[in-house]
């Protein structure tokens, strides 16, 4: 596994949410690295909604060196995604709920994000669906057993607040959230910020909005999910290094990121898939809080 350092732009100001879930205890030391790695392996084994080997075909083309990733040079004359079995994957309930959420956000920071009732309903439908899965059940039970939450209901409420609560990255309107940053991506200060979800990347490339330039890392896993680092342009805006789980289910991504965000905030979190260890970097927003002193997700991505 190639280890890389990825930079994610963080918000400049944040505003608290109206949701007041039960306080989460500060018990970072109660989950050991071995326990976190073991749970991540359980997620990997339990991801029944992941893509099979024939469901996605990638066309990686050119591998960029460290000196080439920031140039914006297009080394790939073809698309990254040669084939995705949409009829199979996107018909699965958690994928379908995710796709419904991905058109709810403005591309650029600085524009206020409104959340009408229809979008709140889509958020709730997504959460309801992932909470039916074995992966999220395992995560919830782990958090309860370790004292992070007292119940699945309190965890679910906090999960919604940390991921979907709005804040501002521009000292202006409420224009961002952890979910928007990680799963949708944003244009911030003239660059692509966030965007760490393979489904959104695929949809952007399919619609002609993203131009794939090259890759700089390909994980050791032979099937899905795997981890990649890509260079791309969204419209004219460059992403020098963007890391992704590819072929994973939405519940897998949320579970891995949330596991590390809660237990190892603002840190490199050591996790494991198929016997191979890698890291997830998490960032919290430190200048403002929601609920009883808790922080929104700023970013989370694999390394």
Curated annotation (Swiss-Prot):
Role description: Endoribonuclease that cleaves single-stranded RNAs at 5' of uridylates and releases a product with a 2',3'-cyclic phosphate at the 3'-end.
Domain EndoU residue range list: 32-303
Primary enzyme class: lyase
Cofactor(s) demanded: Mn(2+)
Entry superkingdom: Eukaryota
Xref: CDD domains: XendoU
Protein name: Uridylate-specific endoribonuclease C
Catalytic residues, chain numbering: 181, 196, 239
Subcellular location: Secreted
Organism: Xenopus laevis
């Amino acid at each position: 596994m190639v280890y890389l350092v990825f930079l994610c732009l963080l918000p400049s100001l944040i505003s608290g949410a109206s949701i007041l879930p039960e306080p989460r205890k500060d018990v970072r030391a109660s989950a050991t690295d071995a326990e976190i790695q073991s749970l991540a392996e359980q997620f990997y084994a339990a991801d029944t909604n992941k893509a099979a080997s024939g469901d996605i075909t990638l066309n990686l083309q050119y591998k960029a060196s460290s000196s080439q990733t920031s140039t914006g040079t297009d080394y790939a004359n073809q698309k990254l995604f040669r084939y995705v079995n949409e009829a199979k994957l996107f018909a699965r309930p958690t994928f379908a709920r995710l796709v419904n959420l991905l058109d709810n956000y403005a591309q650029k920071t600085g524009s206020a994000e409104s959340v009408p009732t229809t979008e709140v309903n889509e958020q709730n439908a997504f959460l309801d669906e992932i909470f039916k899965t074995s992966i999220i059940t395992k995560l919830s039970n782990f958090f309860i057993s370790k004292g992070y939450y007292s119940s699945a209901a309190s965890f679910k409420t906090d999960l919604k607040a940390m991921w979907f609560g709005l804040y501002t990255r521009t000292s202006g309107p409420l224009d961002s959230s952890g979910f928007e940053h990680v799963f949708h991506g944003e244009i911030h200060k003239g660059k692509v910020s966030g965007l760490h979800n393979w489904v959104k990347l695929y949809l952007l490339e399919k619609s002609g909005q993203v131009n794939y330039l090259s890759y700089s890392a390909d994980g050791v896993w032979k099937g899905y999910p795997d981890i990649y680092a890509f260079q791309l342009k969204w419209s004219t805006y460059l992403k020098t290094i963007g890391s992704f789980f590819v072929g994973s289910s939405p519940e897998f991504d949320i579970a891995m990121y949330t596991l590390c965000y809660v237990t190892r905030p603002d840190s490199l979190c050591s996790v494991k898939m198929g016997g191979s260890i890698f890291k997830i970097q998490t960032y919290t927003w430190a200048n403002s809080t929601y609920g009883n002193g808790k922080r929104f997700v700023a970013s989370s991505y694999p390394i």
